[in-house]
Amino acid sequence: MATGPRYFVPFRRRHEGKTDYYKRMSLLSSGTPRMVVRKTNRQIIVQLVVPEVEGDSTLVAAYSAELAGYGYEGSTASTPAAYLTGMLFAVKALNAGYGEAILDIGLARAKPGARVFAALKGAVDAGLDVPYGESILPDEERLKGAHIAEYAPERAGDLVTNVEAVALAIKKELV
């Protein structure tokens, strides 16, 4: 006599393709807050998240749309924007009293030089302690936007100097 179904229904977020529970468990077991980097078609989002029983809590967040307030003139979804957003996030986190984190890129592919690693480089350059390997980081020229100025000089304008000026403006906010 059979009892119950013979199939297994996965967790809803796994079924929707939103969560890798094996990777999530390994990140949570460290006990360190997570630096969550997510990229959309229009912006980069970086958050400091801690797990709780009721659900994860976001302690600090930075969005690439905030860069316009610092004088940034480029695209908010580019590699330089990811670098500056990571730097802005680190300044906010350090000012709030959080000095370390571990990187959580979610379901994004870990390709060397990707925008999620540009955000990591920005956070590390601003002083946040995040473990990483040197081989995954983008080149300095890509972080400053030189590759954009090379293939689209009329659209980029003076992007390299703009990125450097915005980086200095963000670092001035560090208390």
UniProtKB/Swiss-Prot annotation:
GO BP term, pick one: translation
InterPro entries: Rbsml_uL18_euk
Domain of life from the UniProt record: Archaea
GO terms for MF: 5S rRNA binding; structural constituent of ribosome
Keyword field: Ribonucleoprotein, Ribosomal protein, RNA-binding, rRNA-binding
HAMAP family in alphabetical order: Ribosomal_uL18_A
Protein name: Large ribosomal subunit protein uL18
Organism: Methanoculleus marisnigri (strain ATCC 35101 / DSM 1498 / JR1)
